[in-house]
Amino acid sequence: MISNSEYHKEYMKGTTTVGLLCNDGVVLATDKRATMGNLIADKEAKKLYKIDDYIAMTIAGSVGDAQSLIRLISAEAKIYKMRTGNNMTPLSCTTLISNVLHGNRHYPLLTQLILGGYDLINGAKLFSLDPVGGINEESSFTATGSGSPTAYGVLESEYKSDIAIEKGLLIAVKALSSAMQRDAYSGNGISLAHINKDGVKLYSDAEIEGFLKKINRKR
């Protein structure tokens, strides 16, 4: 029988996620590898989720905890829209998630989250949340997971204020690509999205491959 502490060491974990604030929206990116100890448990793990028409979120940490939270928040966003006729704002969604996480602080959900969204009044917003509900509103970029030190190296050197989404997409892909080369717990491809005044766009594998080719040509 596995003890509770041993279980926490062995749960499926997501690893590298990135968020960038751009002048016309937000970019989010994740790798696709989930690990359980030294085992690659999933090569197609979903770590990037569309929550609402103008909100998306990345997960790192316990996949089960994060998926449970995603289901709850997605349902709450739909109920909010049905009742009010409006989409939940990124700040409101982040506050709701924070309250849920803080309510479980004695038995915390083992996950780190990045939430990106577009408020039709206040523009693009980027937030990060810790496992007990702490909120940081990011003014530039953020990264989570075991590959984040490498990703931060790329973000620090490449990111400039007031970049457009097109440039932000390339930086995010480059940061994830570098993390996957250096971190054993990151890999197996990239998930990518941007959020702007037109809503959430999730990129296909073919489109992401096109970004990787552009990056490689510049090296």
From Swiss-Prot:
Q: Where does this protein reside within or beyond the cell?
A: Cytoplasm
A cellular component term, taken from the record's GO annotations: cytoplasm
Activity regulation statement: The formation of the proteasomal ATPase PAN-20S proteasome complex, via the docking of the C-termini of PAN into the intersubunit pockets in the alpha-rings, triggers opening of the gate for substrate entry. Interconversion between the open-gate and close-gate conformations leads to a dynamic regulation of the 20S proteasome proteolysis activity.
- Name any one GO molecular function: threonine-type endopeptidase activity
Q: Does the keyword Iron-sulfur apply?
A: no
EC class:
hydrolase
Would you say which domain of life the source belongs to?
Archaea
Catalyses which reaction?
Cleavage of peptide bonds with very broad specificity
A GO BP annotation: proteasomal protein catabolic process
UniProt keyword annotations, A-Z: Autocatalytic cleavage, Cytoplasm, Hydrolase, Protease, Proteasome, Threonine protease, Zymogen
Catalytic residues (UniProt): 15 (nucleophile)
**Which HAMAP family does the entry link to?**
Proteasome_B_A (MF_02113_A)
Looking up NCBIfam families in the UniProt record yields: arc_protsome_B (TIGR03634)
Q: What is the name of this protein?
A: Proteasome subunit beta
Q: Which organism is it from?
A: Methanococcus maripaludis (strain DSM 14266 / JCM 13030 / NBRC 101832 / S2 / LL)
Name the gene for this chain.
psmB
